[in-house]
């Protein structure tokens, strides 16, 4: 199928927008080009057998609005008419959704494409800066977020258009660099023999790292959830949790720095999601920035590159709303990812 974008095609309002993650799904309806999205309560994906059930019960049955179009962001690659979600049992079948829910037009994007779209739609009040110089107005950007997994997407500016670049950067290799790393990495759980960024830099990865540190030191792991570990680490209440959080932000700095180099992100590197928002105090210590900038021979470049934590609680929906209102602002590839009634 030929490359296609939405420069000359608009979506019919009202538009349902949805950010579908591995654990939670967030929905809103955009009534027109000027209205703020009408948001709905967060949906737990485990509470519904299918996405159609969730949309019908949690959204359509709760409003008099009848969406004509839908723009959905899903956790995982978008390929074909059946889209499996990473870390969820839901399968997105746009043609079935059109038949059962009455949509005439559906666009499905990667969830971190939506996060990338949000980067140019959010104001400074929703960004917490973590060092670096002033961002270049049209400089390339990259977004990464530890959550259920580790999402990554780029955003580049060309021909007066912002172009999101989705990918699976969270599955890049993550290796040891220090003597302490060498002690800990043998105890990390692996996937087919390898440690990727997502094996450490996400919720379950935080637990993986915590347990590996405990095993390396022959100590008992007292906590079993990411929330317990981050809370204890931030409060300096548990020695293993403190080291876990310190190493977590160090490894996140390394990966964020690598991605900043890949995209030459003079427009900024953006951290998103609930974990990043919760650990801002840890990100502001010197460990994250030191790891981020330790990219010889480009240390000076990295020292100038700004990093931000996105603090908006519904950033992806904000990005989807911006796209739904003015598709021409963004060079979103829709070939193979848009379904319309003829």
Swiss-Prot record:
Entry EC number(s): 2.7.1.2
MF GO annotations: ATP binding; D-glucose binding; glucokinase activity
Highest taxon in the source lineage: Bacteria
Pfam family name, one: Glucokinase
Biological process, per Gene Ontology: glycolytic process
Subcellular location: Cytoplasm
UniProt-listed CDD domains: ASKHA_NBD_GLK
Reaction catalyzed: D-glucose + ATP = D-glucose 6-phosphate + ADP + H(+)
InterPro entries linked: ATPase_NBD (IPR043129), Bacterial_glucokinase (IPR050201), Glucokinase (IPR003836)
Coiled coil stretches, renumbered: none
GO terms under cellular component: cytosol
Top-level enzyme category: transferase
Primary location group: cytoplasm
Alphabetized UniProt keyword annotations: ATP-binding, Cytoplasm, Glycolysis, Kinase, Nucleotide-binding, Transferase
Residues annotated to bind ATP: 18-23
Family recorded in the similarity comment: Belongs to the bacterial glucokinase family.
NCBIfam families: glk, PRK00292.1-4
Protein name: Glucokinase
